[in-house]
Amino acid sequence: MDSQKEALQRIISTLANKSDEIQNFIDTLNHTLKGVQENSSNILSELDEEFDSLYSILDDVKESMISTIKQEQVRKSQELQSQLSQCNNALENSEELLEFATRSLDIKEPEEFSKAARQIKDRVTMASAFRLSLKPKVSDNMTHLMVDFSQERQMLQTLKFLPVPKAPEIDPVECLVADNSVTVAWRMPEEDNKIDHFIMEYRKTNFDGLPRVKDERCWEVIDNIKGTEYTLSGLKFDSKYMNFRVRACNKAVAGDYSDPVTLETRALNFSLDNSSSHLNLKVEDSCVEWDPTGGKGQESKIKGKENKGSVHVTSLKKHTSGTPSPKRTSVGSRPPAVRGSRDRFTGESYTVLGDTAIENGQHYWEVKAQKDCKSYSVGVAYKTLGKFDQLGKTNTSWCVHVNSWLQNTFAAKHNNKVKALDVPVPEKIGVFCDFDGGQLSFYDAHSKQLLYSFKTKFTQPVVPGFMVWCGGLSLSTGMQVPSAVRTLQKSENGMTGSTSSLNNVTQ
């Protein structure tokens, strides 16, 4: 019966996954169909605009050429009209002179004839007919303004759609995810020397397989990539996967997207649990700050409602004036009713835990303290850590502790044992937890120098733990285990600092 139920559950799970996959594909088809309709409409509009632009250019050129022909016609006509007018005047003068000369032949008197002859000679000498060119200044030839658009017609007949680059092919084998960086590599299916650049798009997702159309996150765009490889660095891996796609572009147009590739980007993401922290801690998702006035507003509300309320408030004021040390602030200074739901830690345990438990695998996160922070601890603990317990003072917690209040100390702590660390306190501490391997190591986050390493066997899930007094801490999560740390872990066999080295060291 049980085996049949398990088999049925597997079948149900398989069917559910297949249904989800088909639904995602249906969404993709609908999205693609909508895109085809919208893009076709846009392309038709662009085509109309292009042809209208051609028509406009042709009309402009036609008008310009017509104007040139008409101007040439006017010029030649004016030249010929001017020459024609001159010829008519010369002809008229010549005919008058001819008539006068003909009449002079009939003169009988010698003196009068001689006078007429001299006049005719002078008029002939001055006659415009003898100075006039009888060659037209312009010809009627207009062939220099003829056109032959056969070549242009051939060019117009060769109009076609732009050559579109083929879709690139992303090579998952060549892609690399390491050190919170992702390198994506691709190639063209065939050589294309007209490609100018590539566009890569990516988005984060929590779904494996093909990208989902209804994914809440938008595609981010990296443009003008000249090579066939690109690296995104400095990422926060706050999702399980990332989708990538690439398209090639020539000088005019972008081609189709490559088939999308989904790369795994798992990393430990957690926030600080504000609901269970000490009341003297001001907690946000990724930072915690010590607040000596924490809970005062709530205490004032209950003042006068209890017989001993005034005593508690007076005691609290004495202890919170100035900057008290951890030893001077006690649980008795705040009535239990004030803490309400935030009584997970109290007394001198200025503790806040992460909201995500570690049950397996290797994980890494980093912590940075404020410059004026007096005291803080960073490590892990079982969920059973007591409300009065401080990190490192029980057998259920491991940490490194920094104190600069009375004297500067840097130590590893576990089970109320202390191991002084003879290394400078780094600006930022990296925490590496190998749950299955039973190892907790601390590093200088910048240089990746190993500070200390605990070797143990975790019997319960652990949660990141933090203590802070007079100062604050900021947290960086969503980080992969750095390559340098992985390399050091392979060479470091747990011999450098272990819990056994703390057994004989008193606090």
UniProtKB/Swiss-Prot annotation:
SMART domains: BBC (SM00502), FN3 (SM00060), SPRY (SM00449). Residues 105-162 form the COS domain. It holds the Pfam family SPRY. The keyword Phosphoprotein applies. Residues 291-484 form the B30.2/SPRY domain. CDD domains: FN3, SPRY_PRY_FSD1. Residues 298-309 have a biased composition (Basic and acidic residues). Residues 321-332 have a biased composition (Polar residues). InterPro entries: B30.2/SPRY (IPR001870), B30.2/SPRY_sf (IPR043136), Bbox_C (IPR003649), Butyrophylin_SPRY (IPR003879), ConA-like_dom_sf (IPR013320), COS_domain (IPR017903), E3_ligase_FN3/SPRY (IPR050617), FN3_dom (IPR003961). Residues 292-345 are annotated as: Disordered. This is FSD1-like protein.
